[in-house]
């Protein structure tokens, strides 16, 4: 399975602190995928000589095919190479200036691994940029969503899922309804480049996901909570991560301006296919045994052959942004 990771930077933080963690997470995420890698840099901390964040630019029609594209509010870089070959020091200045960033390391389950259009982050629809770890039933998603999903450019289930989410932009409960329609394994992160002050992170069935904060108030997420412990050990405890496993069926809306914080939580019913838990053993790559056992003990997903509980999406916590 793929690896996802990201950060939202505290405004008063030394930019290199969170940037170093982000790059280190990318290297650790190679444990979960080496077929392709990429990252998106979101917003701007407005360095000296600049006023405010860049405005969103319309995504070019071929954005999903490009190895690098500047969308104004978001810059996307990706390649069909592992993270260690993709990342270069020339990206450090832009990363230090970004308010948020998220990355992806691909272990291909659907779609040609050697084709750039299938590498993430994916730029889709009217301006959604996202990454996905998992394997979902794309045909069922197209069939079950009444509003329909536009045609895909590539061959991945991730693109279909992100196109479905693009249709619910700006509607938190509507987004949870889309996630509840998903059948299969999923953990993902995305932004609406027209409203980059919020980053969305969600966990569906099975695929692990954790969020963490460090001693300077930076907020992170990653496929494995184990990675945060490794990095803290390497730093001699200086990073001081506080780590939380994200439960199945949870969408988090994270403020990417001001002080990073989870502004809203929305729950939905996660659904897996029969056998998903043993068909994809790589979902636990990079996760130590203690964390695997904890995730498994907390599992709450429904198997597709069983009846839905009928509760629908539920906004369980909300706070004003800004």
Labelled PLM ranges:
Residues 1-322:
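Conserved short alpha-helical segments that host acidic/polar catalytic motifs at enzyme active sites
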């Amino acid at each position: 399975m793929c690896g996802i990771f990201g950060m939202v930077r505290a405004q008063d933080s030394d930019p290199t602190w969170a940037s170093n963690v982000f790059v280190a997470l990318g290297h650790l995420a190679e444990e979960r995928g080496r077929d392709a890698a990429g990252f998106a840099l979101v917003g701007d901390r407005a360095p000296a000589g600049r006023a405010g964040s860049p405005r969103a630019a319309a995504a070019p029609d071929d954005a999903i095919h490009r190895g690098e594209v500047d969308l104004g509010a978001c810059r996307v870089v990706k390649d069909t190479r592992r993270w260690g070959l993709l990342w270069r020091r020339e990206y450090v200045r832009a990363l230090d200036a970004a308010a948020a960033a998220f990355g992806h390391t691909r272990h291909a389950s659907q779609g040609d691994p050697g084709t750039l259009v299938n590498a993430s982050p994916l730029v889709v629809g009217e301006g959604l940029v996202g990454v996905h770890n998992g394997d979902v039933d794309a045909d069922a998603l197209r069939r079950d969503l009444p509003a329909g999903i536009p045609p895909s450019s590539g061959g991945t289930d991730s693109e279909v899922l992100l196109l479905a989410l693009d249709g619910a932009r700006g509607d938190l409960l509507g987004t949870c309804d889309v996630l509840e329609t998903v059948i299969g394994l999923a953990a993902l992160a995305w932004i609406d480049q027209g409203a980059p002050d919020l980053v969305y992170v969600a966990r569906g069935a099975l695929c692990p996901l954790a969020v963490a904060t460090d001693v300077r108030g930076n907020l992170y997420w990653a496929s494995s909570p184990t990675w945060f412990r490794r990095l803290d050990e390497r730093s001699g405890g200086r990073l001081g991560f506080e780590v939380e496993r994200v439960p199945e069926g949870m969408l988090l809306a994270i403020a990417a301006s001001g002080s990073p914080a989870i502004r809203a939580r929305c729950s939905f019913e996660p659904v897996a296919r029969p056998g998903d838990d043993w068909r994809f053993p790589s979902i636990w790559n990079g996760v130590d045994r203690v964390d695997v056992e904890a995730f498994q003990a907390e599992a709450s997903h429904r198997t597709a052959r069983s009846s839905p509980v009928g509760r629908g999406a539920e906004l369980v916590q909300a706070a004003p942004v800004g």
